[in-house]
Amino acid sequence: MLARDTGRLQRTALHALHVSLGAKMVPFAGYDMPVQYATGVLKEHLHTRRSAGLFDVSHMGQIVLRAKSGRVEDAGRALELLVPQDILGVAPGRQRYAQFTNEGGGILDDLMVANFGDHLFLVVNAACKETDEAHLRAQLSGMCEIEPLPDRALLALQGPKAESVLAKLCADAPAMRFMDAGPRKVAGFDCFVSRSGYTGEDGFEISVPAGQAEELARLLLAEAEVLPIGLGARDSLRLEAGLCLYGHDIDTMTTPVEAALEWSIQKARRSGGARSGGFLGAETILAQLDQGAPPERRTFWIDHSSAASTGVVMVSMSWP
């Protein structure tokens, strides 16, 4: 963990709310973020599994990708130059998990891509959002307009009771299916809502104008089922669910196949598919899909109360 230096850290629109709720604030991806509240990481983790937790993920990047032709299909074709996923197959009102790859097939970042009817809406990782934007501009500026949305916050409401909670503020919420995404009214605010998340639970991610984020967060926290949840529990929840964290489980030296993410590469982009290849790193990734590759990502238990830090050498004294 980096040493705390709030003088150089950015703050999300919910920073004052976190402090008022007694959050322990730590540096993360250039932001002063809540790692936990007084309830502690374990209780926050279990509460999300049993009820509903509210996460501030406003540090993540939100980007609009709009084709200069005005056709969302052209934006999809352009983005398919940079990711191995079938973006043209994402119907309006739906979203898909994807990865930016480099020439060697390594992962530059992972992201969500939503089709909003006349443009694509991307959510990228906080630590990579500036390089992702630069990558998009360098590769696609001749075909697309790239518009970051720094004036929007992003909230994640996660857990088995997330639907019943959000339904009180958004009448459309119960009808949304997993990975549905699009503009919705939430408490009268103009939001972008997806039925998704990164905890392994049912839930919703809500993009809201930054100036309205605290009011919306307070409305959600006023529900008895909802507790504020920090990044510590977000990390343990995604790890328990087997979800990758960029920079830890995946990076530029790991291909999607080596990361056991081949499930995210649709048939249309594979060998023999309708639009096979054509993305950065296609030669390596398609060869691995066809011939196999040893997995670089594994999950195992440590029989100790302390967590292993990133980069430490793991030794098993009883490995067969």
Label every PLM stretch briefly:
Residues 61, 96, 109-110, 180, ...:
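Residue-level marker for the onset of beta-strands and adjacent loop->beta junctions
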Residues 81, 85-139:
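Well-ordered mid-protein domain cores that form the structural environment of catalytic cofactors
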Residues 2-27, 33-35, 115-320:
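Conserved, structured C-terminal
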